[in-house]
């Protein structure tokens, strides 16, 4: 139970730091519209899945962003090591957060239902 609280705190800190690193350190234009939405850590803090969303819905932009994030993983880990006081920085895996697109699709459907009911 104590590990869960600690891993949640570390996950929030990693999310905040990676967002800051993206904005201030990474100069790659492919990650310009990337926003880190969540970080999930394993109980032993050795693996972190970093979920991100994009402002663009184009598949090519998604591939480019995924490639750029994977390429910048070393930079993220070294910057996290400088900024955080944990013993070992977790291995980072990036995954696209599909919940943002899913939520906007549901919102669009609900708006469509509202428009139909008004007529």
From Swiss-Prot:
GO CC terms in record: cytosol
What are the subcellular locations of this protein?
Answer: Cytoplasm
Under Pfam families, the record lists: RBFA
Q: Keywords assigned by UniProt? A: Cytoplasm, Ribosome biogenesis
PROSITE patterns from the UniProt entry: RBFA
Give me any GO biological process, just one: maturation of SSU-rRNA
Could you name the domain of life of the organism this protein comes from?
Answer: Bacteria
Instruction: Outline the subunit composition.
Output: Monomer. Binds 30S ribosomal subunits, but not 50S ribosomal subunits or 70S ribosomes.
The record's similarity note reads:
Belongs to the RbfA family.
The UniProt function text for this chain reads: One of several proteins that assist in the late maturation steps of the functional core of the 30S ribosomal subunit. Associates with free 30S ribosomal subunits (but not with 30S subunits that are part of 70S ribosomes or polysomes). Required for efficient processing of 16S rRNA. May interact with the 5'-terminal helix region of 16S rRNA.
Record's NCBIfam families? rbfA
Protein name, please? Ribosome-binding factor A
The coding gene here is rbfA
